[in-house]
Amino acid sequence: MPQTISRVFLIVLDSVGIGELPDAARYGDEGSSTLGNLAREIPLRLPTLRSLGLDQLVSLGGANTIPPVGAYGRLAERSPGKDSVTGHWELMGIVLEQPFPTFPSGFPPEVIAEFERRIGRGSLGNVVASGTEIIDRLGPLHMETGKPIVYTSADSVFQIAAHEEVIPVPELYRMCEAAFEQVGKGMGVGRVIARPFVGQPGSFKRTANRHDYALDPMGETLLDVLTRHSLPVLAIGKVQDLFAGRGIAQAVHTGSDAEGMDAIDAACRSVTSGLDFANLVDFDVHYRSEEHTSEFQSH
C-alpha cells in the first residue's frame, strides 16, 4: 500500500542557489550559482544534503561518496521577477503573469513627497542600495536629523531603515504601515520592510526587529487548501509576513537562523501533521557578499 505522509517540512535557504535560470541576463545574474561558485573556493561537506542528493545537482567539491537516499531535483521559477514574495507564492501555487513593479532609479519624487506627508517628516536616501551599505553611509545623518532612510533594491520593495534609539520600533512600524497603504495597496509594490538597526557610526548592526508587510496572495494557495482540510500550517521566520498571515495556523518569528533551526527542531518533536514552512534568511542578510565566503560556508 502507498505510504501516507502526514507532515512535510519545507525549508528555504534564502539566496542559496545552484545555478542561473534562463532569464538570468534580465537581472544581471549570468553565471550565478551560489553553492557551485562557493565550492570552487571552499569544498563543502554537507553530509545530510549530499545524502539527499544535492551533489547530484551541483558540484560541491571533494569526493562524492554518499549515495543519495532522497528524491532530488531542480526548480525553475515560471513567474517573472525574483523577489521573496514571488518565489514563495509560486512554491505555494501562485504563478504571476506580471512582475511586481521595481524602481531602479528610486521612487518618483511625488511618491516620496506623499510618504513624507503621511509620516510627518522628511526622509533620506531613495536609492537602490544594500541595507548594510546604506545604513553605514546615511546612518550618521539619520541620527542627526531623525529622518528615516528609504531605499529599494532589484526586488519590488520599499525599505525603511531607522536607528532604534532615534525612531523607536513601534514608530518605525507605523511608518511602514503608512507606506504599505500608499505603495503596497496603492501601487502594487510587493513588500514594505522595516529595517531597524542599532550601534554607533562605523559599527551599525541591523536587529531582529525586521518586519515585512506584503500584499495578500492573489488567489488560493496551498496554505489555504491545507487549512480548509484541517491540516495545520506552521510558519517559521519571515514566511507569515510573505503571505500576509493567510492560511497559517501558527507562526514563529525568529531573530536568527539558529532560532529558526531551534523552531524546526521543536516542530519535529511536537507537530504530527500538516506543513511546517521555514525560511532561513541569514544567508541573504549577513553572508551574501564575497568578503563573507568563509562565514557563509561555516553557517
Model-based region annotation:
Residues 1-5, 138-140, 175-184, 221-228, ...:
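Short amphipathic alpha-helices and their capping/turn segments at secondary-structure boundaries
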Residues 3-5, 15-163, 167-170, 195, ...:
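Active-site nucleophile/metal-coordination loop of metallo-enzymes that catalyze phosphate/sulfate
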Residues 9-18, 294:
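Metal-dependent active-site segment of extracytoplasmic phospho-/sulfohydrolases and closely related
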Residues 146-149, 190-192, 264-284:
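Active-site regions of oxyanion-processing enzymes, predominantly non-cytosolic
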Residues 162-163, 170-237:
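Extended, H/D-rich, highly charged conserved domains that either
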Residues 233-245, 272-288:
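A glycine-rich, aromatic-flanked flexible loop/lid motif
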Residues 235-264:
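Functional beta-strand-loop-alpha-helix junction segments that form "active/interaction loops"
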Residues 291-298:
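Conserved small/polar residues in nucleotide/adenosyl-binding loops
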